[in-house]
Amino acid sequence: MSLFLRKRCLCLGFLLFHLLSQVSASLRCPSRCPPKCPSISPTCAPGVRSVLDGCSCCPVCARQRGESCSEMRPCDQSSGLYCDRSADPNNQTGICMVPEGDNCVFDGVIYRNGEKFEPNCQYFCTCRDGQIGCLPRCQLDVLLPGPDCPAPRKVAVPGECCEKWTCGSDEQGTQGTLGGLALPAYRPEATVGVEVSDSSINCIEQTTEWSACSKSCGMGVSTRVTNRNRQCEMVKQTRLCIVRPCEQEPEEVTDKKGKKCLRTKKSLKAIHLQFENCTSLYTYKPRFCGVCSDGRCCTPHNTKTIQVEFQCLPGEIIKKPVMVIGTCTCYSNCPQNNEAFLQDLELKTSRGEI
């Protein structure tokens, strides 16, 4: 081999070694994070979240099931994925996989990990790592009768799975049934209702009322369904909501008749709204609901929705709809929080009722 060919092979070998070193280095966390991340957030596929890389330096698109992963390219942990590096002797790269979990047994039927099933018309359940989690289909604890409903109670409706709220004391529960629909804890906003949209689209606009907040204190979520879009398709909308802060001091009850909600005072100074790892760019003085002197639940009565800008990752600003309370009122039927529901559901599951 000539001297020229030997030099050329040596140069190519050095270049290949340099490229492999760069690729290997890009898979591991650097000793220091770069001084600045890309100004443009990564463009992820629909349904794929933007997360911090495994080094907590810059945002990247979360890797999905079956895709390659490393320290710099983490798997989507919110989907239960982990990076399996058993095939790499250097333990640097791997494949995003779902951990193998235990099966579930319910009412004599075996369900695989991740399998969804409906034990009856009232619940939708999922088997996850040997545990069964269920969500209710009947939202009677979220959809409450109005404050003008005397002696509300649940009644079974022939041919339907879910019970309905009824008003009055009639034994049959037919005259006082609320038209087959329960009234939500929130009153309609200006945009809520059924009205004819643009005649050229030939779409009848339908929007439900907002559900009760998922948490009795602290930041929660509220949902509704609407077809207010160009496709005239029913879609689910969510908004953030906070009925009262969890650290709120109990109010001194002065109204003995119990006809009014004792509203809490606004914050003396404006506060930042927070959810998960996000903080609002601007400060607000929100109004909260207090307590009822007769022991009933004090929940929002009139609300509106505003768009609030939050900053989550450095340089990333998102907008979220947030509930703003106008007035509050007292209810006899209190919406259950998630913890209470889970305890009740666990009890029913142990008894084999669902």
UniProtKB/Swiss-Prot annotation:
Domain CTCK span(s) in chain numbering: 261-335
Disulfide bridge positions per record: C29-C55, C33-C57, C37-C58, C44-C61, C69-C83, C75-C96, C261-C298, C278-C312, C289-C328, C292-C330, C297-C334
Keyword Signal recorded: yes
Deletion phenotype: Mutants develop normally but have enhanced arterial neointimal hyperplasia in response to injury. Animals show an accelerated bone regeneration comparing to in wild-type mice.
IGFBP N-terminal domain segment(s): 25-99
Gene3D superfamilies named in the record: Complement Module, domain 1, Thrombospondin type-1 (TSP1) repeat
Lipidation (S-palmitoyl cysteine): C241
Role noted for this protein: Immediate-early protein playing a role in various cellular processes including proliferation, adhesion, migration, differentiation and survival. Acts by binding to integrins or membrane receptors such as NOTCH1. Essential regulator of hematopoietic stem and progenitor cell function. Inhibits myogenic differentiation through the activation of Notch-signaling pathway. Inhibits vascular smooth muscle cells proliferation by increasing expression of cell-cycle regulators such as CDKN2B or CDKN1A independently of TGFB1 signaling.
Name of this chain's protein: CCN family member 3
Name of the coding gene: Ccn3
